[in-house]
Amino acid sequence: MTLPELPKDLVEEILCFVPATSLKRLRSTCKGWNRLFKDDKRFARKHIEKAAKQFQPLTLTKNYRICPINVNLHGTTPSLEVKNEWIELGDRYNEDKDSEIYEFSSDSWRVIDDIIKPPHYMEYFRKCLSLKGNTYWLGIDRRRRPPDLRITLIKFDFGTEKFGYVPLPPPCQVHGFEASRLSAVGDEKLSLLLVGDSTSNTELWVTSKIGEANVVSWSKVLSLYPKPNVGFWHGLSFLLDEEKKVLLCCKSKGWMKEEDEDNVYIVGEDTKFILLNFGVQTIGGYSPIIVNYVPSLGQIELAGSKRKRDY
């Protein structure tokens, strides 16, 4: 007796809840599933909406290696694995004051006309962050002078092609605290690392879900005192596990050296940390970056080519 086949619509509905990395392994099962996962934009959009999100921390080292980080907080030693031997990236400074948007469909840059740009200096070591169709920066108002400098959170909305501001949590307005780094919690919230002076805590703040309300609110989720001996200033990027109250930091051991070591620090609520080392990096002047990669069935269509790039 053969089992009856499930209706196609029901099969697709079930597959919509399967993580993207698991679906990739199913592509070789049959030609129909291969076409569904690879070429069906309708299914890809439906899968993005319904499937549970997978977050894989990745680091880009100073030697341009991409390394996934597996973190187990239950006794197993964390590990690093090199997945890509070499990536070529541009490293020149662009002093052009125009604002431009790169469009994949035309493989070209487009200058945004009639845009009011904020009078802020975006420091290169305070890296930008993209979330929910917006890009965010921490900037310093050029019109202020020490000791009246204040960090501001700036956003650019790709839908309206306008700059705007996001209010920062109260400690940012108090002497002794400064917004040091910006990151994301999953794909819904911003997180902010506030570094205090020698007598203050180091704090982690998280926003409400971006896009659910017109006004963004902040809540403090982690306070570290005494400060762990990690070095929260130059060259640091981080991810926060809001539920487990764990901070994952990536930075160079030194700063602006020709030979240096890239390290990952796993910091807990008790300020104790685990150190993972990438080894010696030979390219100076760059900082390692840590990001959350979310596998999906979405594809980027490149201009002038039938090839698609998975992400």
Swiss-Prot record:
CDD domains: F-box_AtFBW1-like. Pfam families: F-box, FBA_1. Residues 1-46 form the F-box domain. It comes from the Eukaryota. PANTHER family: BNACNNG10540D PROTEIN, F-BOX PROTEIN CPR30-LIKE. This is F-box protein At3g18320. It comes from Arabidopsis thaliana.
